Amino acid sequence: LHGIGMGGMDALKGRYLDNGMLDFLIKEREAGRIRNLGFSYHGDIEVYDYLLSRHDEIKWDFVQIQLNYVDWKHAKETNARNTDAEYLYGELHKRGIPSIIMEPLLGGRLSKLNDNLVARLKQRRPESSVASWAFRFAGSFPDILTVLSGMTYMEHLQDNLRTYSPLEPLTDEEMDFLEDTAQLMLKYPTIPCNDCKYCMPCPYGLDIPCLLYTSPSPRDRS
């Protein structure tokens, strides 16, 4: 179920509950026509908590959440509607529900850090890419089913293969290091846009993410 949480409980009831759609999908899974039933979460935490409260009944096979080393503790500082990934993941982990991770690079922002933060990461691991830190973070927790990655070039694929084959989980000290990095990143003025394009198409024909990215106000740069 895609985009669960957008529109709140009213949207959930209208799309999946009141019309019997969720019950139908559960029966289709029982019949073997659906292998895995899950949802991707965006937005309203009331919806997230409600669906997880029914896990014993529904038995979710997976849930897709936004998780990265900034959103882990600072989600609302990047987007006011978001919830800390520490909470989202924690609620899944305690129920034994596998997680699919989206936005491990926070819309690419964690691969395009300013020069000071790049130098900070490179000083620690000169041979590793900036993006690999975020991918290692996303893969370091138990019950992670997969980590999504939007790869544009062959170099991105090769870097991901180096990161995950095999994965070297972050140490506790490296976790603290990335938390400090996140706090430093948030000190720089940014426009909270992840280039998700949910604001598109614009009724006025504007390319909103592109305009924000090229704005004189800093977004990912300092």
Where are these regions (language model features)?
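Single conserved hydrophobic/aromatic residue that forms the stacking wall/gate
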Residues: Y213-S222
